[in-house]
From Swiss-Prot:
Transmembrane segments annotated in the record for this chain: 77-97, 105-125, 136-156, 175-195, 221-241, 249-269, 367-387, 410-430, 451-471, 499-519, 535-555, 582-602
GO molecular function, one term: glucosinolate:proton symporter activity
Protein family: Belongs to the major facilitator superfamily. Proton-dependent oligopeptide transporter (POT/PTR) (TC 2.A.17) family.
Gene encoding the protein: NPF2.10
Name the record gives this protein: Protein NRT1/ PTR FAMILY 2.10
One GO cellular component term noted in the UniProt record for this chain: cytosol
Organism whose genome encodes this protein: Arabidopsis thaliana (Mouse-ear cress)
Expression induction or repression: Up-regulated by wounding.
A biological process term (GO) from this entry: glucosinolate transport
Phosphoserine carried by residues: S52
Known tissue expression: Expressed in stems, flowers, siliques, roots, shoots and leaves. Expressed in veins and in adjacent mesophyll cells in leaves, and in the root vasculature with highest expression in lateral branching points.
Region described as Disordered: 1-45
Length: 636
C-alpha cells in the first residue's frame, strides 16, 4: 500500500537546496522543539482513535441503492413542490398581490438571497450540532408548511387584495396580508436553506465510500440528483406555470403542496434504513484558531525556511490532503511559530490550539482566503443571471407570446425554461464534443482549467446582456412604431415582436451557467479542505444570495435615480416607456470590468497542490512514511 505526496517543480528545486530535508513541508526542526515542555496527556492516542473509528465504521450497514427510492423520490417531489411554488412567484406578486413590477422583483431577489444565505447557516448547524438527517427532517416539513401558507394566500379571498383587472390604479395588499405572505416565504427560507447544502451529502452517506460499488453508487447518485433537479424545473416552468397562469392560481398552488406532502411521506418512510452520520464539529473553529493565533503573535518576526521551522504535527488519522507550504498570506504563518512558553501534549498536539496551530491548518485557511477574490468576481457575475431570471418575464408579458395559429400563449414565466434548456444541451455538447477536442490541444484531462471554464462563462454572460439590450430595443421600437396586440394588465401595450426573440439571450445565459456555475461548484469543491465540503457547496449559494441582494439594490437605485431623468425612468412599469435596454448595456459594462478583475485574480491564484500542468506525483513507501512520523515523534 502506498501513499502519495504532491510536489511541483519548484518544490523539487527547494528540495535540492535542502539535502537533509526529506519532506520539506512535514519535517519539523528538532532544534526549535527542544525548549518546549511536554505535558502528559490522559487522552486516547491516535492509534486508539483510529481503531475506535474503524470499529465503528465496520458496524455501519450501507444499503446504497436500496434506500435510493426514498431519497430520490423525496428529492423529486420536493423539488417539484418548491420550484412549482416559486417559479411563478414574480407573476403571482404582480397579478394577485397587485405589487409594482420593481417591488415584486426586489422582493424576489431579497427572498432568493435569504435562501442562499440560509444554506451557510444550515451547513454550520448541520455539521456542528444536528447532523444531516435531523436538518433535512426539519427542512422538508418547513417547505411543506411554506407551500401551504402560500396556497392559503391564493385560496382565501381575505388573504390577498381585490382583483385589479385592467384598472390602471389597483388596491395594494394590507399589512396583514403582506405579513401572512412573508410567513410562508419564511418557512420556505428555512426549508430550502436546509435542503440545499445537506441533500446531496445525505444521499452520498448511504454508500460505502471505501468500496468500489459504493464509489460508483455515489457518482451515479450525483447524476440522478442533477437529473431530478432539471426535470423538476422544466415540469414546474411548463405544466405547473401554465395551470397557475391560465386555469387557477389555487389549483396551480395545490399541486406543489400535494407534491411536498408526498416528499415528506417518502422521506420519513425510509427512516430506519438510512445511514445517519453524526455531527462531528464545525471546521470553522479551526479557521478561527489560526486567525486568533496569528493575531496574538503579530509581533513575531517571520521564520526562515518556514516549511521546515514551523510547527507541523500531522496526526495519523489526519483526513485532509497534506498541503505544501505557500508563501502567500505570510501573516498567517505566525500562528504556527512555536515559542518557549508553548507546550505540547505527549502525542505531539498543541496543548492550547488557540495559541499554536499546525502548518497544515494555516495552509487550509490560506486555501479559503485564496478563493475569496474568485468568489467575489463570481458573485458579480451572478448579477447577470439574476437579471436574466426576472426581466425577460416582464419583456415576455409585453411581447407576442402566441405560438402557431391556434391561439396558444406561452406563459411569461415559462420563457426561463430556455435558459435551462440551453444549459442542459450545452453540458452534453461540452462533455461529449468540446472536452475531447480541447484535451488534444491542452493535454488537460478536463480540456481547460477550472478558472478558464469560469472565465468562459463570464464571457457568455457579457454576450447575453449585450444581446438582451438589442432585443429590448427592437421590442420597444415595434411597440412604438407598429400596431400593437392590445394591453397587458397594469403595464402597457403588447409589442408585435414575437417573444421567441428572447430565446437567444436566454440561451446565451444558459451556456454561461454551463461554464461558470458548474465550474464554480467543482472549483470550490476541489479547492476547499476535505473537512469543509459542505461549506464548499454552501459558499456557491451564498454568492448567489449576495448577488440577489446586489440586484435588488441595483434595481432600486436605478429606478430611483432615473425616475425624474430627461430620458425617462429606465425601469418604468410600462416597458414601452422605459429604457430597459440602457439598463442591460450598463450591466454589460459592469460585467466587462468584472471580467478584467477576474483575469487578474485568476493569474494570481494558485491551485491547491500546484497547477494542473506542474504537478508531479512522487510515490513513497508507507514504511518510509511511518519512519518519518516516528522521527518526528522522537524529536518531541
Amino acid at each position: 500500500m502506498k501513499s502519495r505526496v504532491i510536489l511541483n517543480h519548484r518544490d523539487r528545486r527547494d528540495k535540492n537546496h535542502n539535502n537533509n530535508n526529506t519532506n520539506h513541508y512535514t519535517q519539523v526542526d528538532t532544534m526549535e522543539r527542544k525548549p518546549l515542555e511536554v505535558e502528559p496527556s490522559t487522552t486516547t492516542t491516535n492509534t486508539d482513535v483510529v481503531d475506535s473509528f474503524e470499529e465503528e465504521q465496520r458496524k455501519i450497514v450501507y444499503r446504497g441503492w436500496k434506500v435510493m427510492p426514498f431519497i430520490i423520490g423525496n428529492e423529486t417531489f420536493e423539488k417539484l413542490g418548491i420550484i412549482g411554488t416559486l417559479s411563478n412567484l414574480l407573476v403571482y406578486l404582480t397579478s394577485v398581490f397587485n405589487l409594482k413590477s420593481y417591488t415584486a422583483a426586489t422582493i424576489i431577489n431579497a427572498f432568493s438571497g435569504t435562501i442562499n444565505f440560509g444554506t451557510f447557516i444550515a451547513a454550520f448547524l448541520c455539521d456542528t450540532y444536528f447532523g444531516r438527517y435531523k436538518t433535512l427532517s426539519v427542512a422538508v416539513i418547513a417547505c411543506f408548511l411554506g407551500s401551504f401558507v402560500i396556497l392559503l394566500t391564493a385560496a382565501i379571498p381575505s388573504l390577498h387584495p381585490v382583483a385589479c383587472g385592467n384598472k390602471i390604479s389597483c388596491e395594494g395588499p394590507s399589512v396583514g396580508q403582506i405579513l401572512f405572505l412573508l410567513m410562508g416565504l419564511g418557512f420556505l427560507v428555512v426549508g430550502a436553506g436546509g435542503i440545499r447544502p445537506c441533500n446531496l451529502a445525505f444521499g452520498a452517506d448511504q454508500f460505502n465510500p471505501k468500496s468500489e460499488s459504493g464509489k460508483k453508487g455515489i457518482n451515479s447518485f450525483f447524476n440522478w440528483y442533477f437529473f431530478t433537479f432539471t426535470f423538476a424545473q422544466i415540469i414546474s416552468l411548463t405544466a405547473v406555470v401554465y395551470i397557475q397562469s391560465n386555469v387557477s392560481w389555487t389549483i396551480g398552488l395545490i399541486i406543489p403542496v400535494a407534491l411536498m406532502f408526498l416528499a415528506c411521506v417518502i422521506f420519513f418512510a425510509g427512516d430506519r434504513l438510512y445511514v445517519k452520520v453524526k455531527a462531528s464539529g464545525s471546521p470553522l473553529a479551526g479557521i478561527a484558531r489560526v486567525i486568533a493565533a496569528a493575531i496574538k503573535k503579530r509581533g513575531l518576526k517571520p521564520v526562515k525556511q518556514p516549511w521546515v521551522n514551523l510547527y507541523n504535527h500531522i496526526p495519523s488519522n489526519y483526513a485532509n490532503t497534506t498541503l505544501k507550504y505557500t508563501d502567500q498570506f505570510r501573516f498567517l504563518d505566525k500562528a504556527a511559530i512555536m515559542t518557549p512558553e508553548e507546550k505540547l501534549n505527549s502525542d505531539g498536539t498543541a496543548s492550547d490550539p488557540w495559541k499554536l496551530c499546525t502548518l497544515q491548518q494555516v495552509e487550509e485557511v490560506k486555501c479559503i482566503v485564496r478563493v475569496i477574490p474568485i468568489w467575489f468576481a463570481s458573485t458579480i457575475y451572478y448579477l447577470a443571471i439574476t437579471i436574466q431570471m426576472t426581466y425577460p418575464v416582464f419583456q415576455a408579458l409585453q411581447s407576442d407570446r402566441r405560438l402557431g395559429s391556434g391561439g396558444f400563449r406561452i406563459p411569461a414565466a415559462t420563457y426561463v425554461v430556455f435558459l435551462m434548456t440551453g444549459m442542459t444541451v450545452f453540458i452534453i455538447f461540452y462533455d461529449r464534443v468540446l472536452v475531447p477536442s480541447l484535451r488534444r490541444v491542452t493535454g488537460l484531462e478536463t480540456g481547460i482549467s477550472l478558472l478558464q471554464r469560469i472565465g468562459a462563462g463570464f464571457t457568455f454572460a457579457i454576450m447575453s446582456l449585450l444581446v438582451s439590450g438589442f432585443i429590448e430595443e427592437r421590442r420597444r421600437n415595434f411597440a412604438l412604431t407598429k400596431p400593437t396586440l392590445g394591453m397587458a394588465p397594469r403595464t402597457g401595450e403588447i409589442s408585435s415582436m414575437s417573444a421567441l426573440w428572447l430565446i437567444p439571450q436566454l440561451t446565451l445565459a444558459g451556456i454561461a451557467e454551463a461554464f461558470a456555475a458548474i465550474g464554480q461548484m467543482e472549483f470550490y469543491y476541489k479547492q476547499f479542505p476535505e473537512n469543509m465540503k459542505s461549506f464548499a457547496g454552501s459558499i456557491f449559494y451564498v454568492g448567489a444570495g449576495v448577488s440577489s441582494y446586489l440586484a435588488s439594490f441595483l434595481i432600486s437605485t436605478v429606478h430611483r435615480t432615473t425616475a425624474h431623468s430627461p430620458s425617462g425612468n429606465w425601469l418604468a412599469e410600462d416597458l414601452n416607456k422605459a429604457k430597459l435596454d440602457y439598463f442591460y448595456f450598463m450591466l454589460t459594462g459592469l460585467m466587462v470590468v468584472n471580467m478584467a478583475y477576474f483575469l487578474l485574480m485568476a493569474r494570481w491564484y494558485r491551485y491547491k497542490g500546484g497547477n494542473d500542468e506542474d504537478i508531479t506525483e512522487i510515490e513513497t513507501n508507507e514504511e518510509e512514511t511511518k519512519q518519518q512520523q516516528l522521527q518526528d515523534k522522537n524529536s518531541v
